[in-house]
Amino acid sequence: MTQQFYVSPEQLMKDRADFARKGIARGKSVVVISCEDGIALVAENPSPSLHKIGEIYDKIAFAAVGKYNEFESLRQAGVRYADVRGYSYDREDVTARGLASVYAQSLGAVFTAEQKPFEVELAVAEVGATQAEDHLYRLTFDGSIADEHSFVVMGGQADRVASAIDQGWRASLGFPDAVRLALNGLAPAPETEETAKPVPARAIEVAVLDRHSEEVRGARRAFRRLNDADITALLA
């Protein structure tokens, strides 16, 4: 007769959490920063096609670290949720808070019921008419949700990157300064006391939620992805 081994619920949840954290820690960091011009999303990502940052709806964007197939399925589900809700009710009823709640439920259900948790960490950002109306939500692998202010940092080096950004963040930052600040934080720590080498433009992914998209471009869609030339010009 095969002997049954008992694993306490506490140990099971701890093992699941440790497993997810290890997977996330292997991922390169992502930074989401609220600034005067809107919200800047910056990721260390050498792939030109496998995006860590994406558009969800008019003024809502998504950023993630971890396993690509897992967070991409969540991004697509978020787009479907937003489209259906906006069509069934009103476009103004699609909010970052509502989307974050849906993601929290999905992540929590997978964490407790499936064989393995998702190895992902998400950020949902919504740009407002003013900086005070910006919304930043951070979601972890177990469905925990946090309402963040000013900026969100995710990934294996999150603490180091967050510390660097916290020292330089201010409400008056424009898009160029916000992206520079994010890149300075993402730059690998130097092995000596020399200045850290910046991340090259071809190895980063940058997008913005433009606070003034309706005024400048006449479009409700605030999301805009920057190519290498745009990034170089922005940082010039």
From Swiss-Prot:
Sorted UniProt keywords: Cytoplasm, Proteasome
Compartmental location: Cytoplasm
GO terms under cellular component: cytoplasm; proteasome core complex, alpha-subunit complex
Pfam families, alphabetized: Proteasome
Record flagged with keyword Cytoplasm: yes
GO MF annotation, one: threonine-type endopeptidase activity
Activity modulation comment: The formation of the proteasomal ATPase ARC-20S proteasome complex, likely via the docking of the C-termini of ARC into the intersubunit pockets in the alpha-rings, may trigger opening of the gate for substrate entry. Interconversion between the open-gate and close-gate conformations leads to a dynamic regulation of the 20S proteasome proteolysis activity.
Pathway linked to the protein: Protein degradation; proteasomal Pup-dependent pathway
GO biological process: modification-dependent protein catabolic process; proteasomal protein catabolic process
Function per UniProt: Component of the proteasome core, a large protease complex with broad specificity involved in protein degradation.
Assembly mode: The 20S proteasome core is composed of 14 alpha and 14 beta subunits that assemble into four stacked heptameric rings, resulting in a barrel-shaped structure. The two inner rings, each composed of seven catalytic beta subunits, are sandwiched by two outer rings, each composed of seven alpha subunits. The catalytic chamber with the active sites is on the inside of the barrel. Has a gated structure, the ends of the cylinder being occluded by the N-termini of the alpha-subunits. Is capped by the proteasome-associated ATPase, ARC.
NCBIfam families in the record: 20S_bact_alpha (TIGR03691)
Family per similarity comment: Belongs to the peptidase T1A family.
Protein name: Proteasome subunit alpha
Origin species: Pseudarthrobacter chlorophenolicus (strain ATCC 700700 / DSM 12829 / CIP 107037 / JCM 12360 / KCTC 9906 / NCIMB 13794 / A6)
Gene, per the UniProt record: prcA
